[in-house]
Amino acid sequence: MSEHTDVLVLGGAGVDTIAYVPELPLPFQDSYVVAAIEPRAGQTGDNVALGLHTLGLRTMHVDVLGDDPEGDLVRAFHTRHGLPFAALPTAAGTKRAVNLVGPDGRRLSLWDGSREAEEDRYPAALIAAHTAHARHVHVCITPPGQHVFGQLNDLPVTVSTDLHNWDGAYEGFEVYAFNADLVFLSATALTDVAATMRRVIDRGRARLVVATDGAHGGSVLVRGETEVRRYAAVAPEAPVVDSNGAGDAFVSGFLFGHLAGEPLETCLRYGAIAGAYACTIPATRAGAIDRAALLRPAA
């Protein structure tokens, strides 16, 4: 493991098949004619790793992959972007999903739940080697990430996770919510955003919780503070075409600021800028904001 690693990203490597549909929700009918349906690598871990890498942070990505066409796409993605990647074999196959994308950029994701193997683990020796000199670890909510916190909690490294559209009740994500120092999630499925954020702080080790809410900005709660703060969204500089990956981009932008020692307000702005940029990139191609573009509006 290089001693010059800023962030280790665990999990979230996979393939999405993108279908642009005339509207969401999609009314029932026998068939629809849509534009080209394209499979492409770039699930949450791929996106976070690419975002950090593009911002100049030295990034290592580790995940389980199948010996299948989807795995080949993921390997090619990392090679194409010069992104260091360690693939561990899994009999379950590479993670995959079908994403329906509406004209306004909103996404409905159909996750293939068959591509998970209970026996999969990140080897302890591998984690030890890759965290020996890392500054930070980002754990995606994909198996076998739920098993790694026992080891990470004993290491002098900060940890983040993104709970995506967690409803605050699903117990399977609590291991992530309660064992990370920085917790990100979407507000879309939460009935009480503030209560969920306080529960994550009270039950776990989080230093702060960020709930993103798209064009409405979002909320942040810091340990030791009683009030939930609001932060503003950033208007995209180009038309919105796809929200896929916006949350991943927010995480990348926020972590860039956090690891640079920037104040919370700056980290939130970096995240908002990166997320807005991601909404202007079609999901059928990979693209992340670079450092110059991120810093230009924030200056």
Swiss-Prot record:
EC number in record: 2.7.1.187
Presence of keyword Disulfide bond: no
Catalytic activity as recorded in UniProt: acarbose + ATP = acarbose 7(IV)-phosphate + ADP + H(+)
Record carries keyword Protease: no
Cysteine pairs bridged by disulfides in the record: none
Alphabetical UniProt keywords: Kinase, Transferase
Molecular-function GO terms, alphabetical: kinase activity
A Pfam entry, by short name: PfkB
Main function: Catalyzes the phosphorylation of the alpha-glucosidase inhibitor acarbose. Phosphorylation of acarbose could be a resistance-like self-protection mechanism.
Membership in a protein family: Belongs to the carbohydrate kinase PfkB family.
Protein name (Swiss-Prot/TrEMBL): Acarbose 7(IV)-phosphotransferase
Taxonomic source organism: Actinoplanes sp. (strain ATCC 31044 / CBS 674.73 / SE50/110)
Gene, per the UniProt record: acbK
